[in-house]
Amino acid sequence: MEFTLRQEALVNSSWEAFNQNLPLFSVLFYTFILEKAPIAKNMFSVLKDANEIPLANPSINAHTEMVFEMVRDAAAQLQTTGQVVLGDTTLGVVHTQKRVDGLHFMVVKEALLKTIKEAVGDKWSEELSNAWEIAYDGLAVAIMKEMS
């Protein structure tokens, strides 16, 4: 299945909405993850010693921005080449060290989609959701390949 220019545009425009309030959406993103998988807290160095998700924490914002930017980049790669190649091959090592598995990728995908839904409000659609899902899945597959 081809990733279309329209899908890439949907990811880009919704990423822009997300990026307009990065501190809020960073907290939401991690809140969604921890609601679903509280044990995942120890997998994130930025949360390990925190009792709650701190608002406007530069480390949390940077990590959240990196995750969403990698999905955005995956969308661009899927549109132009049909595959995702990691720019940072150490991601496989880091995810292996943290003992990330397929279920963790699913939890993060769900949190990512919920966060984008909050960011875009009434512009949320099945088409937008599908574009982010496909891009995220492409990124997840690339990371899992590096893990093996």
UniProtKB/Swiss-Prot annotation:
Ranges of residues in domain Globin: 2-148
Keyword Iron among UniProt keywords: yes
Post-translational modification Nitrated tyrosine, affected residues: 30, 136
Record: residues binding O2: 63
A GO MF term: metal ion binding
PTM (free text): Nitrated in effective nodules and particularly in hypoxic conditions; this mechanism may play a protective role in the symbiosis by buffering toxic peroxynitrite NO(2)(-). Nitration level decrease during nodule senescence. Phosphorylation at Ser-45 disrupts the molecular environment of its porphyrin ring oxygen binding pocket, thus leading to a reduced oxygen consumption and to the delivery of oxygen O(2) to symbiosomes.
Signal peptide: none
Pfam families linked: Globin (PF00042)
Compartments, record wording: Cytoplasm, Cytosol; Nucleus
Gene from which the chain derives: LB29
Subunit structure: Monomer.
Species of provenance: Vicia faba
Highest taxon above the source species: Eukaryota
InterPro entries, per database record: Globin, Globin-like_sf, Globin/Proto, Leghaemoglobin-like
Keyword Transport part of the UniProt annotation: yes
Main location as per UniProt: cytoplasm
Keywords carried by this UniProt record: Cytoplasm, Heme, Iron, Metal-binding, Nitration, Nitrogen fixation, Nodulation, Nucleus, Oxygen transport, Phosphoprotein, Transport
Binding site for heme b: 45, 95, 98
Tissue: Accumulates in root nodules after inoculation by bacteria of the genus Rhizobium. Expressed in mycorrhizal roots in the presence of the mycorrhizal fungus Glomus fasciculatum.
GO biological process, one term: response to abscisic acid
Official protein name in the record: Leghemoglobin 29
Gene Ontology cellular-component terms listed: cytosol; nucleus
Record-annotated disulphide pairs: none
Family assignment from sequence similarity: Belongs to the plant globin family.
Function: Leghemoglobin that reversibly binds oxygen O(2) through a pentacoordinated heme iron. In root nodules, facilitates the diffusion of oxygen to the bacteroids while preventing the bacterial nitrogenase from being inactivated by buffering dioxygen, nitric oxide and carbon monoxide, and promoting the formation of reactive oxygen species (ROS, e.g. H(2)O(2)). This role is essential for symbiotic nitrogen fixation (SNF).
Modified residues (Phosphoserine): 45
